[in-house]
Amino acid sequence: MEKTIAAISTAPAPGGIGIVRISGGEAFAVAEKVFRGVSGKKLSQMKGYTAQRGGAYTPAGEKLDDVVALVYRGPKSYTGEDVVELSCHGGLYMTKRLLQLVLDAGAAPAGPGEFTRRAFLNGKMDLAQAEAVMGLISASGEQARKAALAGSTGVLSRKIESIKQGLLEQAAHLAAWADFPEEDVPQVEEAALLEGIRQGEKALEELLQGFDRGRMYREGLVTVIAGRPNAGKSTLMNLLSGCQRSIVTQYAGTTRDVVEETVMVAGVPLRLADTAGIRDTDDPVESIGVQAARQRLETAQLVLAVFDSSQALEKEDWELMDALEKVPAIAIVNKSDLPTRMDVEAIQKRFEKTVSLSAATGEGLAALEQALSEILDTKDFHPQEGVLFTQRQRMDAQTALDSLREGEQALVLGLTLDAVTVCVEDALHALAALTGEQVSEEIVDRVFEEFCVGK
């Protein structure tokens, strides 16, 4: 029998309540050593999905706190085991004391993600669903939440299962033909086999194409705000972040360090970096900031290139445009509240999207959000349809796709059907690894060590 485990499942911060979760064959026995209900009914006598008010007591009979106990009976629980959740007042000290009482009563400390790991091992979810649970916990926006929720309810798993079923039909026919050549087994129709393989390829290609976009919503985009000094970069940073994150003055060269903030724009988390104004300078401190700005441009996933429309284009503006030729970027013609002296058409010719904006007043912010939505192609992302969440899933899907492409090539070149069979079976193994049907304990350990304790 697995040991009974316990952990604090609420955040390590003061709050309205704190929850200690207990799971395992001895969950009721352990909890009953700590909890006394006002009704006098023991937890082991309660039905699943019921609650009782009471208190938590030390072995000496001293009351620690008022507590509500929630009972879940296996297998109809999150972990598939008997589960008790004890809710107390949410002070850090109080919750830790309650956990210690539970551990002293016989429970073992839970490791990272151990509750969800048990749910996986007990067949309550597959590995892809478990990783989606982690996605729900870490979701920083609406699209990421929707994708994670869909994954946790099995949408991705059902997609993978559909691909597998199509390939299993092909593999079964190939195996029957190879194993019983003298029996009355229909000949393999190579045209139908080729079509089945290509259908699997298409489905996997669609999943892989959605991975980068899904990651964009989960992890955000490294976004650099760049431009020459006093173009309004820091004012834009403050506008987007909703507070004064960067110092703004009338003097050029005020920003010297890289100032960072994550903001939500057009539904996408932008990991903003406000950099020093790019120019030649004799100031040794400012030159370090300028060098850091140039380095950030090389690794940026998106650049907001800010130009001061109240001034004519200068050498630094042209150099910035040259540096961004191969980088996804939006030109922001700033200071639209002032008379325009800049050749805006010259900028428009160099960028896919150009937005006129006043970072000082906020006018044009909606246009910037629209431009971001278009350049990032957010309208065609449908998170409820199921997306790949992790690099592990992406690698397994890519392995399956590569195997199918090899099988298609073998078929087209006229190689033996045995060679095609090996490729189809390799694809099936990769898909089984993706959902956790065939996966090593090392991989399982690696997945769940990313979780927090208590989940």
Mark where each language-model region is:
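Short glycine-/polar-rich loops that comprise or flank the Walker A/P-loop
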Residues: 15-17, 49-52, 299-303, 326-329, ...
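Switch I (G2) and immediately adjacent beta-strands of P-loop GTPase domains
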Residues: 52-65, 69-73, 253-281, 299-302, ...
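A glycine-rich (often HGG/GG-containing) alpha/beta subdomain
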Residues: 1-146, 150, 154, 330
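Glycine-rich, N-terminal phosphate-binding loop of Rossmann-like dinucleotide-binding domains
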Residues: 88-90, 240, 275, 307-310
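C-terminal-of-GTPase-core extension/linker across diverse P-loop GTPases
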Residues: 2-8, 12, 142-264, 281-283, ...
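Conserved beta-strand segments of alpha/beta enzyme cores
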Residues: 108, 269-271, 353
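Inter-motif core of Ras-like GTPase G domains
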Residues: 286-310
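Short, acidic/hydrophobic/Gly-rich beta-strand patch recurrent on exposed beta strands
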Residues: 21, 237, 274
